[in-house]
């Protein structure tokens, strides 16, 4: 539908762009009055060329989840994605998800219901935001949305998950973990792709290579009614919507923002490309409060550049060593390996494993895929001494490390690092993957209110502007909570 400038008046007056550092644009009226003073390069009047009930910016799991219930309800939904395909950062996720009381968990004999799970965690989940009287109910809604997302994804969108892990397979976390059908790292195939395909089947439109540059309001202090994009040819595209959802991810690939908010990470490499903080900046320009931008130090972590391998220690015995051949961490805690390696003076480490990792159904596909994809970082040998040579670490030190580790196994106690789960010896042939410490995700950003609309600097909701996923403070950049915040937004919009 082509909308003219005259049509805009019918929708509540002249629309205006909200300028951000990503795109400088002046309100049309001001441009007309001050044309003699100059002209902003590449500024243009608002000219809506498309319209939808809901415009979702970003197609990671948060964005896709935000579209599920609206699509089922028959809403017209447009997804806009700056990359050439869907998935966002979620495409490279480990897909280590959590839920309680979902249908597959109950069917597997796990007896905890969502109501029981909430009762156990309600006090913790609702703490910290006493200034908002609505927060406890919102926190409950987000928590329940996590389980609802799992059930809806399976029942209505054709997603496939593994049978829940047993306590023997996952000693620390078994009852609450949800994994895609072939385990860790297979979420693109079994979660993202089915959801995206079903959304298209339900009539949702996907616009790729569309970079969001500025939100559009119906007045400078009014409601958000759309967004301006730049397409692959550099032309502006303005899309109008009754609700605009920011699902734009974090800011881990924005060196300027990382330097400002997370200076300790500024000189680290980055694994996930494209998380530039555009949503943060566009929302701030529209009057949104941006908070807790340094919370990555609490809720996120540096990661290995083969992120799946960072989780294998939950499922199988591993030995992690530094380039000096020494252990440096309790391997079941390997999400913290990057930080521990840096503290020890290194930015790299080796994950050493054996056939037990190939046989563990929850990580087997991930192990096989990663040694094939990362052949340059993969080594194997029949003895520890030969493995040390292949890894270019001191053979005498690595041999001593394994002798010490095997002693702890025999004693039934890891006196060095306190490892309990998977305190087992490795046997030949031995395998190793080299990991480098990188930035992987960030936390902090927008706060949403009781109706899932973004809060302004006065704590009031900005009409028409919604947010979910890593652009929000309360998703903590976790795969599960990112999906939950998206689904929760979708529940809100499906009934509007």
Regions found by a protein language model. Name each.
Residues 50-52, 234-243:
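Core beta-strand elements of the Rossmann-like FAD/NAD(P) dinucleotide-binding domain
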Residues 1-2, 23-61, 71-72:
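C-terminal segment of N-terminal export signals and the immediately downstream linker at the start
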Residues 1-16:
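N-terminal secretory signal peptides and thylakoid transit peptides that target proteins
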Residues 397-475:
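A glycine-rich dinucleotide-binding beta-alpha-beta segment and adjacent secondary-structure elements
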Residues 140-235, 255-256, 409-427:
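Conserved redox-cofactor binding core of oxidoreductases
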Residues 73-90:
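Glycine-rich FAD pyrophosphate-binding loop
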Residues 239, 243-303, 488:
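Glycine-rich loop(s) and the adjacent beta-strand/alpha-helix scaffold that form part
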Residues 280-282, 289-393:
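An anion/pyrophosphate-binding glycine-rich loop and adjacent beta-alpha core
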């Amino acid at each position: 539908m082509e909308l003219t400038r005259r049509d805009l008046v019918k929708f509540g007056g002249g629309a205006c762009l909200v300028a951000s550092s990503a795109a400088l644009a002046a309100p049309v009226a001001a441009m007309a009055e001050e044309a003699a003073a100059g002209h902003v390069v590449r500024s243009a009047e608002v000219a809506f060329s498309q319209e939808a009930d809901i415009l979702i910016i970003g197609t990671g799991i948060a964005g896709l989840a935000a579209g599920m219930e609206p699509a089922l309800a028959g809403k017209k939904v447009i997804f806009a994605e700056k990359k050439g395909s869907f998935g966002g950062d979620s495409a490279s996720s480990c897909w280590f998800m959590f839920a309680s009381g979902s249908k597959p968990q109950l069917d597997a004999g796990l007896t905890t219901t969502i109501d029981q799970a909430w009762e156990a965690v309600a006090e913790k989940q609702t703490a910290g935001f006493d200034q908002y009287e609505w927060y406890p109910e919102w926190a409950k809604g987000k928590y329940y949305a996590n389980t609802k997302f799992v059930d809806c994804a399976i029942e209505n969108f054709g997603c496939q998950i593994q049978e829940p892990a047993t306590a023997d397979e996952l000693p620390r976390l078994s009852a609450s973990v949800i994994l895609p059908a072939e385990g860790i790292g297979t979420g693109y195939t079994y979660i993202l792709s089915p959801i995206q395909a079903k959304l298209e089947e339900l009539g949702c439109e996907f616009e790729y290579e569309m970079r969001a540059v500025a939100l559009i309001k119906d007045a400078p202090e009014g409601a958000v009614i759309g967004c301006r994009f730049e397409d692959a040819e550099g032309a502006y595209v303005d899309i109008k919507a009754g609700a605009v959802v920011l699902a734009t991810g974090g800011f881990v690939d924005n060196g300027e923002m990382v330097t400002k908010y997370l200076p300790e990470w500024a000189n680290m490499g980055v694994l996930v490309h494209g998380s530039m903080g555009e949503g943060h900046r566009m929302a701030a320009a529209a009057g949104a409060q941006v908070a807790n931008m340094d919370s990555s130090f609490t809720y996120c972590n540096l990661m290995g550049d083969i992120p799946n391998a960072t989780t294998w220690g939950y499922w199988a015995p591993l030995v992690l060593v530094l380039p000096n051949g020494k252990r440096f961490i309790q391997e079941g805690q390997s999400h913290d390996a990057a930080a521990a390696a840096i503290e020890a003076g290194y930015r790299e480490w080796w994950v050493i494993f054996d056939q037990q990792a190939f046989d563990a159904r929850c990580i087997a596909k991930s192990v096989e895929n990663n040694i094939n994809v990362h052949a340059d970082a993969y080594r194997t040998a029949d003895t520890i001494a030969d493995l040390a040579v292949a890894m270019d670490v001191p053979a005498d030190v690595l041999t001593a490390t394994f002798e010490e580790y095997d002693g702890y196994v025999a004693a039934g106690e890891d006196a060095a690092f306190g490892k309990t789960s998977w305190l087992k010896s490795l046997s030949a042939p031995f395998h190793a993957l080299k990991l480098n410490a990188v930035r992987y995700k960030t936390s902090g950003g927008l706060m949403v209110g009781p109706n899932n609309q973004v809060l302004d600097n006065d704590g009031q909701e900005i009409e028409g502007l919604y947010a979910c996923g890593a652009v929000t403070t309360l998703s903590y950049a976790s795969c599960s909570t990112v999906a939950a915040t998206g689904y929760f937004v979708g529940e809100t919009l499906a009934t509007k």
